Amino acid sequence: MGRRARDRRRQLQPQQRRERSGGGGGGGDDQAGWAGGYPEIVKENELFERYYREQRIVPDGEWDAFMAALREPLPATLRITGYKSHAREILHCLKEKYFRELQHLEVDGQKVEMPQALSWYPEELAWHTNLSRKILRKSPQLERFHQFLVSETECGNISRQEAVSMIPPLLLNVNPDHKILDMCAAPGSKTAQLIEMLHADMNVPFPKGFVIANDVDNKRCYLLVHQAKRLNSPCIMVVNHDASSIPNLQVDVDGRKETLFYDRILCDVPCSGDGTMRKNIDVWKKWTTQNSLQLHGLQLRIATRGVEQLAEGGRMVYSTCSLNPIENEAVIASLLEKSQGALELADVSSELPGLKRMPGITKWKVMLKDGQWFEEWKDVPSNRQTQIRPTMFPIKEEEKLKAMNLERCIRILPHHQNTGGFFVAVLIKKSPMPWNKRQPKVHQKLPGKTEDTEVTATNAGDGSEDATEKPTLAEDEEPKKVQELQNSDTEQSKKGVCGPPPSKKMKLFGFKEDPFVFLPEDDPLFLPIQKFYALDPSFPKMNLLTRTQEGKKRQLYMVSKELRNVLLNNSEKMKVINTGIKVWSRNSDGEQFGCAFRLAQEGIYTLYPFIHARIVNVCIEDVKILLTQENPFLSKFSSETQRKVKDMAMGSIVLKYEPDPEKPDDLQCPIVLCGWQGKTSLRAFVPKNERLHYLRMMGVEVFKAKRKEGESEGKTEEEVQCRPAQTEEGMDVEDKERDAVTKMEAEIDEESPRSPVESSAMEIENKSEDSDQCSKNTNSHINQESKDMNTNNVKD
């Protein structure tokens, strides 16, 4: 398209938009809401109603209520991050400030409905509200509430997540020492829940467990990284594989290679998504039975691969946002049948009291999109047997069916608690799967082994094909295969490098990622850091890594010991997108301040227990100064703070606030900030949204009134009063990159199966301009170190 054509198109677009918004609904300005100007989708689907009436998933007498609920908009739901020490402060702030402001508020003559806590979610940490975006824009109090939600979401203190999607992680019963696999993890709200559970004890910086979050879609993996990074955990790894063929991983156990089996697996598979009709209204016109018939095979393959990698005694949760028994009970029944007693459905009826649920069904039928029904496989004509498979039908033998206990499955119906539709099944693995009885394990000690020279071994279940269709590897082929992989991997492992696969034959799909290079024990880079910050001897320096093999190391990241083990032993198999949290960044002025590396805020809660020097305890008034002023002079701080920093060398410091129990009106949770002491000043290196979070918790008003048309470009009084300081040279770049990820987040719905964006009050209001550009931006957001060697800007 030429320049003139583009100009003409731009001139026409505003007029076309005005014409569209004035027509159709006949409401003109009244219709210019979130979906203003577009023809309203009729929420009717005769085939849908016929199908589910026949399947009898809805109790007698409740059909009208069920359909009425599906036609109502879905309430927006938020979840307060539970493991952070200030979760109670956020809850207190929500209830005592923002909710109280809404108590007697009226908009357009109608009383605003108060947000309600989810009765079944622990400790009142999840809430839902019917406030729409249109209403949020009509009142300053509501606008403040919206800004609070958006900012806290960006910090990771609040997650926007559909209510029913919170159920699977809760039913996993995660402990901090569990090894967890999230098979289809993007966009990452359930993954965030799992990370929270690992860090249940905030006094343990490195829990023994970890989360490996996988997704088949490369772009969605970067959205997953963005979600996970908000929680600042060293125990999360994001990988990019097809879940139905995700490879077996190896770990070093006392010098031997052993297959990694997971204690917990979340198997939230792709689905037709008819449980999301309340938010994804396109489903009304697009729904057919063909969707479930096409997905059934993939869902069964993913679930099968999951139970293969589950440890004996482990728990796997299978879930979909579909109501269809072909995607739900049929998959579970087929999996139980071929497991030959190795799996059983767990009885979770006593878990999550307050959650209204329906039991799984034992009888269902299969329908084609033309409305033709089949009750048994034998009734299916040969020309239809490519669309319909035997595993889609219920088990006919009554004894076998009864032993499966399919009624232990959970189906959530929308009209019971004003939610979306959902299905959950909890599986326990009692013994190895029948087709994995001869699964080989390598217990071969490597010659001349050191901690950094582990190599990768492989076995039958490395995921190249579905294990039920491929026989296990013959035992006499093992030594040869192991030797081949030793030869290819040992050189990089010796250097502590986990990078892209070196051989073309083993190369994985997708983009080339920067390597993960662990610092060797004798690396001269670490000694000045250890001395400057007086690090505890127990500090696990072997877990430090960088993302470049050459040139100056500009960022230092950290992972847990267990994830280090996984990384070093699987560089040939895994496509790792991201892992670790940033703990140190190189100073732009080099070593003139005693140490070349300053502390990074995202890793400070992990590092703090090991730091014994350069810690300054500050009062709450000092914290307010640090967070509201750009580079305040030392004279502005309390005399006690001035005294503490007077004789301290310039450079990076830790600023610690401890609550005073005798002052209950002050903030009652501890705060740890990264700071910088200059010759005459003291500043905080804290991202903007995190600053706003702490200020809100301290009762400082940080609301920014939106400028109306025609207003000057000057700052509002509130913006000037509480303007967060620009903390780093690279902060502008950080904000732009976060905006790019946020735009992608607006494109990809938080909890739907690869579906349109959810219209909730908490969603950040950005539209994506170009998803390919977003992918490029977010890729650089994660893998910047080796690509930006010539800049001193700080990037995440």
Swiss-Prot record:
Compositional bias of kind Basic and acidic residues: 467-483, 708-721, 733-746, 784-796
PROSITE patterns per the UniProt record, alphabetical: SAM_MT_RSMB_NOP (PS51686)
Binding site for S-adenosyl-L-methionine: C184, A185, A186, P187, G188, S189, K190, D215, D242, D268
Cellular component per GO, a single term: extracellular exosome
Broad EC category: transferase
Disulphide bonds in the chain: none
EC number, as in UniProt: 2.1.1.-, 2.1.1.203
Function: RNA cytosine C(5)-methyltransferase that methylates cytosine to 5-methylcytosine (m5C) in various RNAs, such as tRNAs, mRNAs and some long non-coding RNAs (lncRNAs). Involved in various processes, such as epidermal stem cell differentiation, testis differentiation and maternal to zygotic transition during early development: acts by increasing protein synthesis; cytosine C(5)-methylation promoting tRNA stability and preventing mRNA decay.
The protein's name in its UniProt record: RNA cytosine-C(5)-methyltransferase NSUN2
Organism listed in the record: Gallus gallus (Chicken)
Organism placement in taxonomy: Eukaryota, Metazoa, Chordata, Craniata, Vertebrata
